[in-house]
Regions:
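Mid-bilayer segments of alpha-helical transmembrane spans in multi-pass integral membrane proteins
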Residues: 77, 81, 85, 110, ...
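Juxtamembrane interface at the cytosolic side of transmembrane helices
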Residues: 165-189
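Alpha-helical transmembrane segments and their helix-start/interface "positive-inside/aromatic belt" motifs
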Residues: 16-35, 68, 103-119, 169
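Perimembrane loop-to-helix junctions flanking transmembrane segments
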Residues: 51-65
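Functional transmembrane-helix hotspots
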Residues: 122-140
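Alpha-helical transmembrane segments of multi-pass membrane proteins
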Residues: 32-49
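Interfacial helix-start motif at the membrane-water boundary
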Residues: 62-76
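Short, membrane-exposed interhelical loops at transmembrane-helix boundaries
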Residues: 59-60, 138-152
């Protein structure tokens, strides 16, 4: 029978019992990343709609695809950096862990926040996808759509890779800032 002495407070838990992964920080970073991505994409869409009528005869999809792709890449990077920074900054303090391990864990938190935001966006995309039971397009329209889709996929892939890296770097920066603030408050006591 336990008399309650088995309970270990998280504040004084041995290092072996402390998790290296702070899921609360990761999910908070992912949520912030998704929210920021929606805001940035809305701004880009509004800017694109505002600018597109200025071209005589409108803008063809082939001409507009690189612009949209570059906007997607930029939005992904900025949103992922925010999510990664928050994941690194909000994580718990690890005691008795070497600086190299802290840096690795911070970058892992950024990468996990990025991955969680990608999974969240995929789930939102599946839930919001329209029913595709419309008329069959002509072969020329299908070829044109495939060409545009391939270009956008390339931009989204580049954006995904660069935003994963950006989230990891931002998490390392956020973690360093968190640890620096912790040291500063400790010396002021």
């Amino acid at each position: 029978m336990s008399n309650g002495s088995d309970f270990i407070s998280p504040d004084v838990a041995p290092d072996e019992l402390q998790s290296a992964v702070s899921w609360d920080a990761i999910l908070a970073g992912a949520a912030a990343s998704i929210a920021m991505l929606f805001v940035l994409l809305s701004l880009c869409a509004g800017f694109g709609l505002k600018v597109s009528p200025r071209w005589p005869g409108g803008v063809s999809a082939e001409d507009f695809t690189p612009i949209v792709g570059a906007a997607f890449v930029a939005c992904q990077i900025v949103a992922s950096m925010l999510g990664g920074y928050l994941a690194g900054r909000l994580r718990t303090k690890w005691l008795h862990v070497h600086d190299h391990e802290v840096h690795f864990r911070d970058t892992a938190h950024g990468l996990l926040a990025w991955a969680a935001s990608v999974v969240g966006l995929l789930l939102l995309g599946v839930l919001a996808a329209p029913d595709t039971t419309t008329a069959t397009p002509s072969p020329a329209e299908m070829l044109r759509a495939a060409h545009i889709g391939a270009q956008l996929s390339l931009f989204l892939g580049v954006g995904a890779l660069t935003s994963a890296f950006s989230a990891s770097v931002a998490a390392a920066i956020g973690g360093m800032r968190r640890d620096d603030m912790h040291r500063l408050h400790r010396t002021m006591r």
